[in-house]
């Protein structure tokens, strides 16, 4: 019952915050909970969902290359500006943080609750996008390790 109340609260916050992505995600999870015998699916979705999401995002990022909107000239142009180098560096940093984030989420499940709360606040209150829990977990890992803190 507690999970239903929690999901209902998330749904209300998403509706109040006009966040369609969070509304859709919450409704999908609620529908999955209603379907008989999905108890074994939910851990699979939890475990593999991040990888599936990364795959979908990667497909969306590659579409402009496939349609010819972005070509080799654009790639070379990116290396001619400081902003391009910063973008490459941030891409590398995010990939590294994500690696630590996935490990952190697996090793310390308690961090998930705090990240979910922070993500919901960021999405609803600041009109952010719920695309960064793994990165946030990686950043958490780095700061917690640097400050020698523990959950």
Swiss-Prot record:
Can the keyword DNA repair be found in this entry's annotation?
no
Q: What is this protein called?
A: UPF0756 membrane protein Lreu_0946
**Superkingdom in the source lineage:** Bacteria
Q: Which family does it belong to?
A: Belongs to the UPF0756 family.
* The keyword Cell membrane is assigned to this record: yes
Going by the UniProt record, its keywords in alphabetical order are: Cell membrane, Membrane, Transmembrane, Transmembrane helix
Tell me the organism. Answer: Limosilactobacillus reuteri (strain DSM 20016)
InterPro entries annotated for this entry? UPF0756_TM
Name where it's found: Cell membrane
- A single Pfam family it belongs to is DUF441
Q: Where is the signal peptide?
A: none
Membrane topology value: Multi-pass membrane protein
> What's the source species' lineage?
Bacteria, Bacillati, Bacillota, Bacilli, Lactobacillales
What is one term from the GO cellular component aspect held by the record? plasma membrane
User: Membrane-spanning residues where?
Assistant: 4-24, 52-72, 77-97, 115-135
The UniProt entry, under PANTHER family, shows: UPF0756 MEMBRANE PROTEIN YEAL
